Amino acid sequence: MKIIQEIPEKNIIKLIPENLDDLWHLSNIIQPYNAIYAVTERRTEDKGDKLRADRGTKRRVFLGIKAEKINFHEDFNRLRVSGKIIHAPDDIPIGSYHTIDIEPLLQVSVQKNWKKWDLVRLKEAEDSSKKPKVVVVILDDSEADIFLVREFGIKELVSIKSGVSKKLDYKQNEQAKFSYYSDIINSISEFEGKILFAGPGFGKNNIQNYISEKHKDLAPNVVVESANHTGKSGLSEILKSGIIDKIYGEARISKETQVIEKLLEEISKKGLAAYGIESVNNAMNYSAIDTLLLTDEYLRRNRRNIEELMNSVENINGNVLIISTEHDAGKQLKALGGISALLRFPIE
């Protein structure tokens, strides 16, 4: 995310989202009644040719809308914000509806009452654009699962079988193994960033040696770590371990996974945790909340009702962390009602 300009007296921040992660961050920052300004396409009628049955022509115009609906479309790499027009050229009626498609590299101005957690999230998005992206390959001698680590979740890219079998002789297995390595490399060769190989056994070390010999250009980006499991279980193990943070700086998904692990640990021992809206509100009555945890879905559904609680946590120097439901940690928080808190001290 690039922050272009801040205009505090108007509560406006001009910014440019650079990738899908930035669009996801914006989807959690923009809320109903915020004003959004951007260059967009608008279909207008040709006044001189009213007999034509077409829908007019599209042209690029600078519009402002008051947001009503905010929809993040991962598959289409865009964020759609719909609402009534509040600023437009003279020939476009104020109050009519429009949808602005926010895509990477489109400059957008957001006008809102900026909260601390909004600004923290914006800073995280700005910092994350400077960090290396990470692909995780969880493998053993028989199968490799390749994942892309994003700010808001994990994308499973491909699963590759090795073809190695006890039914084959040594030479055939060696050929199958090198073909396996080649398929893995082909799947990640165009990726610009760090590549983490992890899993049980020596498969991760063997492919590292193969890369050092055959693909020297990739070798500097390769990191190898141990994991006890393969597949998604191995990936979950890696996310909980903090290894991603050592490579990435502090990956948001890793941070979210670790904080939910801490929450579940505290719940299991009836320690410094509260979950469910009643329990969390009770903790706030004692000013006991250190970190308020909300799923993005819960926040979108209840933002107007929950914002007072978020402000109260901020006023006692607590933290507010919004957890994505696109990964397992977010799903675990969702199962707890979508809202929980880590506490400063125990309460009855």
UniProtKB/Swiss-Prot annotation:
Keywords recorded for this protein, A-Z: Cytoplasm, Endonuclease, Hydrolase, Metal-binding, Nuclease
EC number: 3.1.-.-
First-tier enzyme category under EC: hydrolase
SMART domains from the UniProt entry: eRF1_1
Function: May function in recognizing stalled ribosomes, interact with stem-loop structures in stalled mRNA molecules, and effect endonucleolytic cleavage of the mRNA. May play a role in the release non-functional ribosomes and degradation of damaged mRNAs. Has endoribonuclease activity.
Family annotation (PANTHER family): PELOTA (PTHR10853), PROTEIN PELOTA HOMOLOG (PTHR10853:SF0)
Record comment regarding domains: The N-terminal domain has the RNA-binding Sm fold. It harbors the endoribonuclease activity.
Record's subunit section: Monomer.
Protein name stated in the entry: Protein pelota homolog
Organism: Methanococcus maripaludis (strain C5 / ATCC BAA-1333)
Gene this protein is translated from: pelA
